[in-house]
């Protein structure tokens, strides 16, 4: 898998901001087939930082229903919590 296709987009949420400030971690939505090693190499190549560790969370797709009828599905996704080396930073929305 190519590194450009692994990182889909950064997660911008309250929890992701707290984790970034407290533990020097950044959170990304990643390709469902990507593993920890590929994610670490993609982040290092894309942002020129050193990665200390990667934790991965998979969310299953869920059935959406209205009035007892199943009308569709909410797609599943995969998130990666990437821990950066001390002194390294990835700035997405600093100063906004």
Curated annotation (Swiss-Prot):
The keyword Ribonucleoprotein applies. Transmembrane segments: none annotated. GO terms for molecular function: rRNA binding; structural constituent of ribosome. InterPro entries: Nucleotide-bd_a/b_plait_sf, Ribosomal_uL23-like, Ribosomal_uL23/eL15/eS24_sf, Ribosomal_uL23_CS. GO terms for biological process: translation. One of its GO terms (cellular component) is ribosome. Keywords: Ribonucleoprotein, Ribosomal protein, RNA-binding, rRNA-binding. One of the early assembly proteins it binds 23S rRNA. One of the proteins that surrounds the polypeptide exit tunnel on the outside of the ribosome. Forms the main docking site for trigger factor binding to the ribosome. Belongs to the universal ribosomal protein uL23 family. HAMAP family: Ribosomal_uL23_B (MF_01369_B). PANTHER family: 60S RIBOSOMAL PROTEIN L23A. Part of the 50S ribosomal subunit. Contacts protein L29, and trigger factor when it is bound to the ribosome. This is Large ribosomal subunit protein uL23. It comes from Solidesulfovibrio magneticus (strain ATCC 700980 / DSM 13731 / RS-1). The lineage of its organism: Bacteria, Pseudomonadati, Thermodesulfobacteriota, Desulfovibrionia, Desulfovibrionales.
């Amino acid at each position: 898998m190519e590194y450009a296709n692994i990182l889909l987009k950064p997660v911008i949420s309250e929890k992701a901001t707290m984790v970034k400030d407290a533990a020097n971690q950044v959170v990304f939505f990643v390709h469902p087939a990507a593993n920890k090693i590929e994610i670490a190499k993609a982040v290092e190549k894309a942002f020129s930082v050193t990665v200390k560790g990667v934790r991965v969370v998979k969310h299953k797709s869920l059935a959406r229903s209205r009035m007892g009828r199943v009308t569709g599905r909410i797609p599943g996704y995969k998130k990666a919590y990437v821990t950066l080396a001390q002194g390294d930073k990835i700035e997405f929305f600093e100063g906004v």
